[in-house]
Amino acid sequence: LSYKDDVRPQQQKVELWDGPVKPETIRPGSVQWERASLHSAANVLHLSDRLNATPDHPLKYKIAWIGACKLYDTKKLREAGGFNFWRELPPEHSGEDVMAQLKVIEKFGGCGILPSGAYHQEFETKVPNRDVDAFRVLDL
């Protein structure tokens, strides 16, 4: 948590779910896409503190996509197509996790939970060539 003192209010815009999570269509460049910046640095930690989210009072919030830390309902992931597009991608690509998430969110919805207890890992990417994003080259 080397970013815990790096407060970035401009990246902490959040929309809470009021009621059940619902399907949404999210595309690169849309207003909803901007939600992804919430998962940089220690933003989720700061947001949890600001909104007084606790394990006894968790909050569901709208997401675009979440890097690294995510859980799927396996049945819903498969119903949305899962990662069946894998063979259509070139060997050097990125964004397959984003592609799968966008498909699940469009069919079933998706949310983040505060407090998450999971924070930015600060590891360097193992994908050096990130020129091909799956969600940009394949049909969503």
Locate the predicted segments by residue:
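Conserved donor NDP-sugar-binding/catalytic core segment of glycosyltransferases
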Residues: L1-S37
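Generic serine detector
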Residues: S2, S30, S37-S40, S48, ...
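Short secondary-structure transition/capping segments
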Residues: L16-W17, L45-T54, F135-D139
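A recurrent flexible, glycine/aromatic-enriched loop bordering the glycosyltransferase active site
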Residues: E24-Y72
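C-terminal catalytic/acceptor-binding lobe
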Residues: P58-K75, E79-L140
